[in-house]
């Protein structure tokens, strides 16, 4: 994808977000993660050359490692988010390169991240992923366990809970999707503070619903950097 196409898509997303903010009287920023997991290196480089300064989202540990090692040499201040399922044997790559891990879906994984962060002498920012769609194949904590999970993980020395993440059902049913987003927003409202301030919900096809229900971070892939 060329620079002009990327810029046009970015401008369209910003216009949509601003319209939604006006519609719902939202006065806080809504951050965009440019999901690059399906994009070619050429497309990512075109994006970076625009200096738009959005985080890049990767879902596979080796891809994060390889892309970060190559791109960080030539581009300054790239922010990397990890948004995929986490395998304990790949945590070392994720902690080494990710600025924010959005998909922490078990206490065991949080503990692995904490150990690796200690080795790397860093405090790792994370989001807790909740399974708002109740799908077995998706990762995430049960919403009913939010207090126990939050209290246990926040006491780990080298992880920093920045907020929460959820993925909705892929269904043609706005009412169901909105219920899922609102269920996580309710937990976020109870636990948010100056540090725990991110609610990451919504992708290309449903971010308009996520913003309606409190999302302040959205993850856009096919509608932005696309497939290449």
Please give the residue ranges for each predicted region.
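Mg2+-dependent phosphoryl-transfer enzymes with acidic/Ser/Thr/Gly-rich catalytic loops
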Residues: 227-228
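Active-site-proximal glycine-rich helix-loop-beta segment
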Residues: 214, 221
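Paired acidic/hydrophobic, glycine-rich loop segments that form the ligand-binding mouth/hinge
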Residues: 101, 218-219
């Amino acid at each position: 994808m060329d620079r002009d196409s990327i810029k046009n898509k970015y401008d369209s997303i910003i216009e949509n977000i601003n319209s939604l903010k006006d519609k719902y009287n939202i006065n806080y920023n809504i951050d965009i993660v440019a999901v690059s997991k399906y994009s070619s290196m050429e497309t990512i480089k075109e994006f970076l050359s625009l200096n738009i300064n959005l985080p890049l989202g990767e879902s596979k540990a080796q891809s994060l490692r390889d892309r970060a090692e190559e791109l960080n040499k030539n581009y300054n201040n790239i922010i990397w988010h990890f948004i995929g399922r986490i395998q304990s044997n790949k945590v070392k790559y994720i902690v080494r390169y990710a600025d924010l891990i959005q998909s922490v879906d078990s206490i065991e994984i949080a503990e692995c991240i904490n150990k690796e962060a200690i080795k790397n002498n860093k405090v790792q920012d994370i989001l807790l992923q909740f399974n708002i769609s109740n799908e077995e194949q998706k990762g995430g904590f049960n919403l009913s366990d939010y207090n126990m999970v939050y209290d246990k993980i926040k006491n780990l020395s080298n992880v920093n809970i920045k907020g929460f993440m959820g993925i909705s059902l892929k269904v043609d049913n706005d009412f169901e999707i909105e219920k899922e987003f609102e269920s996580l927003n309710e937990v976020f409202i109870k636990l948010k503070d100056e540090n725990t301030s991110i609610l990451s919900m919504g992708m290309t096809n449903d971010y308009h619903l996520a913003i309606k229900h409190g999302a302040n971070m959205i993850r856009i892939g096919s509608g932005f950097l696309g497939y290449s």
